Regions:
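C-terminal nucleotide
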Residues: 4-14, 20-162, 166, 173-206
Length: 206
């Protein structure tokens, strides 16, 4: 909660607890406005934002022991993007074009499908959800040409790939069983890759 509060201050009051909760807890973290079926609830947190009070439930997915050899490869585009600015951009877009709200609903449905696949150890299903999510995010205009190139380069060697974070720059992530090939593909596009095992542990106090 302290880390989330610090991030919110840096992002001018707009920040979800996703990054800080994942870094602290490790594994597979699900951040939602409520407890999510099929997950284990850990704690709740809230934040006063320029748009009003926000509340989140922090949940985790206990991965099956036979999940297999799966990796996440992050690709940094080299361009930063303040979360607050991108959140405001999407809010303004939906305000001007209310029909775009269906993309937000699509992302919610895709996320639930991906969560079901992850809980069952279905990596192919999870990858399909990631691909579909990226397309919806593109329609919300939060992707960039660089992120799209990195995602496209990673997909032939991945189960799925999408932008991660607020968009507008920043990073993409690919789910793969061949992290070396994906890292090479990201580097060819000018991105900087980082590999981590799916379900890695969070912060450890030494």
């Amino acid at each position: 909660k302290m880390a989330h509060s610090a991030e919110a201050t840096a992002q001018k009051g707009r920040a979800s607890p996703t990054d800080t909760a994942t870094s602290a807890l490790g594994g597979c973290v699900v951040v939602s406005g409520e407890h999510v079926k099929g997950t284990r609830h850990v704690f709740d947190t809230s934040l006063e934002t320029p748009e009003g009070s926000r509340n989140w439930a922090i949940n985790v997915v206990d991965l099956p022991e036979d999940i297999g050899d799966a990796w996440l490869v992050l690709g940094y585009s080299g361009t930063g993007s303040p979360t607050g600015r991108m959140v405001a951009k999407v809010a303004n877009l939906i305000s001007e074009f209310p029909q775009r709200m269906h993309e937000m609903e699509a992302i919610a449905n895709i996320t639930r499908a991906g969560l079901t696949a992850l809980s069952a150890g279905n990596l192919e299903g999870l990858g399909m959800a990631m691909d579909a999510c990226h397309e919806s995010l593109r329609k919300l205009e939060v992707s960039t040409k660089k992120l799209d190139r990195m995602v496209s380069a990673a997909r032939p060697h991945s189960l799925g790939a999408k932008l991660t974070g607020a968009g507008g720059g920043g990073r993409m992530v690919a789910l793969t069983q061949d992290p070396a090939r994906v890292s090479e593909a990201i580097e060819i596009t000018g991105g900087r890759p980082l590999q981590t095992k799916l379900g890695s542990k969070g912060v450890i106090i030494l």
